[in-house]
């Protein structure tokens, strides 16, 4: 319901932006609640009752309807609402070569709730060729006009890096990448490939969605992480900054790049809390993006 949509103003360089090009004076993060029809179709596909083509047809129609609503509301960007995804982040990660879908014993822990237990595991070295999200973007691009910009939202490289070491995932990850620097370089290279392919498909606005910084601000999260004495907030934030900035190297000047720093949102609950003081000097001063939400 766009009438209840939260519009997010944001700041870059100390000034509220008011350009007709991104970054915009007001904006959205691009993810929308899934319609009941979409959830029912996805469940029917999982149960083997409809084909992939049938599911895609439902997605196409509902995304088209959503874009019409975004335009009618006067929004400067249009997105697919992330309607083709089961998770906001994992579907993109599963699209890399060398990555497969798995389930863990537990899902992500939110305030009083737990998500489905989806995750990932490596099957080989990570590359970014032929990523399915490029085709997803092309569908949205066709609706772009002189008043709107088609945006592609993707999880940040730091989020991918964190997922590779979530719970027991690190054991498999280290079997393919005993050298952390090689892993960081391959993640960044895979992202650069996808970014190039999106750009070649006409994308001029990409958003990194990133919960890693929010987790670094959460006292309870760090209490648990510090059971491993080798883990420090300085070390973790340095890794996250490095992989994100490496992924952004060489991007075209006319490609706007923003980031949404999120505390998690599942059934209106949160995964992390706390002020930005632990990460502000790194995140806001050194990450090479055009704007933050």
What is each of the regions a protein language model found here?
Residues 15-293:
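Domain-level signal for soluble alpha/beta catalytic cores
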Residues 1-16:
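Short, Lys/Arg-enriched N-terminal segments with co-localized hydrophobic residues
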């Amino acid at each position: 319901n766009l009438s209840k949509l939260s519009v997010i103003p944001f700041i870059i360089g100390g000034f509220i932006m008011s350009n007709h090009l991104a970054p915009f004076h007001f904006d959205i993060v691009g993810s929308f609640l899934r319609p009941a029809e979409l959830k029912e179709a996805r469940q029917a596909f999982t149960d083997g009752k409809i084909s992939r083509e049938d599911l895609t047809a439902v997605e196409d129609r509902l995304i088209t309807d959503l874009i019409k609503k975004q335009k009618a509301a006067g929004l400067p960007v249009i997105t697919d609402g992330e309607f083709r995804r089961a998770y906001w982040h994992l579907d993109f990660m599963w699209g890399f070569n060398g990555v497969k879908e798995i389930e863990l014993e537990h899902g992500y822990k939110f305030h009083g709730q737990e998500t489905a237990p989806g995750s990932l595991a490596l099957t080989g070295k990570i590359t970014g060729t032929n990523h399915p999200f490029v085709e997803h973007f092309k569908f949205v691009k066709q609706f772009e006009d002189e008043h709107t910009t088609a945006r592609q939202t993707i999880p940040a490289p730091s989020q991918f890096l964190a997922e590779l070491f979530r719970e027991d995932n690190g054991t498999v990850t280290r079997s393919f990448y005993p050298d952390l620097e090689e892993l960081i370089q391959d993640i960044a290279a895979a992202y650069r490939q996808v970014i190039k392919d999106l750009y070649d498909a006409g994308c001029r606005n990409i958003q990194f969605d990133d919960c890693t910084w929010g987790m670094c601000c959460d006292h309870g999260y760090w209490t648990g992480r510090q059971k491993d004495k080798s883990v420090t907030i300085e070390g973790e934030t340095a890794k996250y900054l490095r992989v994100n900035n490496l992924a952004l190297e060489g991007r075209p000047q006319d490609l706007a790049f923003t980031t949404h720093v999120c505390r998690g949102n599942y059934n209106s609950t949160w995964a992390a809390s706390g002020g930005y003081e632990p990460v502000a000097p790194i995140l806001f001063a050194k990450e090479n993006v055009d704007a933050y939400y």
